Amino acid sequence: MLVVLLTAALLVLSSAQGVDEEVVYEDSSQQLELEQQSQGHGQHHPKPPPGGLPPRPPASDENGDGDDNDDGDDDGSGDDVNRPERPPQHGGNHHHPHHPPPAAGPQRPPQPGSPQGPPPPGGPQQRPPQGPPPQGGPQRPPQPGSPQGPPPPGGPQQRPPQGPPPQGGPQRPPQPGSPQGPPPPGGPQQRAPQGPPPQGGPQRPPQPGSPQGPPPPGGPQQRPPQGPPPQGGPQRPPQPGSPQGPPPPGGPQQRPPQGPPPQGGPQRPPQPGNPQGPPQQGGQQQSSFLWSFSA
């Protein structure tokens, strides 16, 4: 690349120098044409007799500006070469145009040459573009390749999405499963409610049972009465007493009323119950009652 740029710079400089030289050639050629035209007009008649003597060209050179000779010997030599043509063709003015064309001809080649010179720099510029295009070309394959390259990563990305879908699929089963999972806890909750109901059930029995709890202290008083009836022979009361056995849960309240009546008038049942055997507990109470009455 550096070499190409250097060559391009040299070509540009050379083309610039060529343009300058062409400008100088154009100036000198124009001056020569003017001089030749002036000489042609002033020496048309003298030229034919001498037959194109060489001294006349020197005279023309002397009359001409020395700068023209200084500007370029090539121009002077060209004048010498073209000057023999002047005498035979009294229309040397036309030859001088022909002579400038040679001088202009070099200019024209340099001009196309200068374009050629710049084109090389332009060519290098095109070459760098060509260089990048190769790079761009690689980029294009890489671009399709890079899509291919990324697609593998992109494919993994799609695969991860596929991975998540399995995960999402598990999630879906878990979602129904999670409801199922919660239902088990919910089932335990229901079971727990079922557990509390047993507990609540116990509470309900305890609620009626709590009367049973109090009745037992009052019930022992009743039980001694029950005890006496079996001993007293009234097996019939035990038959209704068996209902009374079940009623304890349902009818302990009746027993408490029965308990208070014994308490209200316990002495009468205890009196028959005293001789019967459970007077131990009931007897103590009756003794307490007797003491109270005696007091």
Curated annotation (Swiss-Prot):
**Record field: compositional bias (Low complexity):** 26-41
Region annotation (Disordered) ranges? 16-295
Keyword NAD found: no
Instruction: Provide the species name.
Output: Rattus norvegicus
Q: What is this protein called?
A: Proline-rich proteoglycan 2
Keyword vocabulary terms for this entry: Repeat, Secreted, Signal
GO CC entries: extracellular region
> Where is there biased composition of kind Acidic residues?
62-78
Predominant subcellular localization, coarse grouping: secreted
Where is composition skewed (Pro residues) in this entry? 48-58, 100-187, 194-278
Task: Name its cellular compartments.
Answer: Secreted
**Lineage per the UniProt record:** Eukaryota, Metazoa, Chordata, Craniata, Vertebrata
- Describe its PTM? Contains glycosaminoglycans of chondroitin-sulfate and heparan types.
Highest taxon listed in the record's lineage: Eukaryota
InterPro entries membership = Pro-rich
Identify the Pfam families for this entry. Pro-rich
Residues making up the signal peptide according to the UniProt record: 1-16
